[in-house]
Amino acid sequence: PTDYPFTPPKVTYMTNDGMTRFNPNLYKCGKVCVSILNTWSGEKWSSCQTINSILLTLCSLLNEAPLENEPGQTKYSKDFISYQKSIEFKNIDFSICDMLLKYTIPQQFQMFYPIMKEYFINNYDKLLTYVQSKSNEISTQHVGIYSMTTNINYSNLENKLIKTKTFIESEK
């Protein structure tokens, strides 16, 4: 904004398929809901905060149990397991494969594509082993709190992961 640092910057979440709520603080529409951006209750933005403080706050959201970021939700909540399974699957399906297959990578983030490819190649064997370990898992997960449904099929995801690697290698 023109009056930065007296007003917080506007932050938009871009790894978004429009259907999956990847984190309670990261909305399907791209809204980032945290107090220091004045988009949630709590400690508000002050001019002594920086882009670095925003990035640190956002990093703190990226944890192994993101539903616990939602007030009143715990690992014992009714949607906890369904949400975990949905996010685990969609992080590989959408956030990795679809982005690398260039189905959904926003134009303004194309500059990060080489870094994404390198990370994928360096971690491909681990990803493939993980997906193969779940190859018999086929389910439909309903997450009531977000009216979210995810069709999970790790066997299909294994094929997509292989396709992604083939695509990346063909670009060399």
Over which residues does each language-model region extend?
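Compact alpha/beta protein-protein interaction domains typified by the UBC
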Residues: 1-78, 98-101, 114-125, 129-131, ...
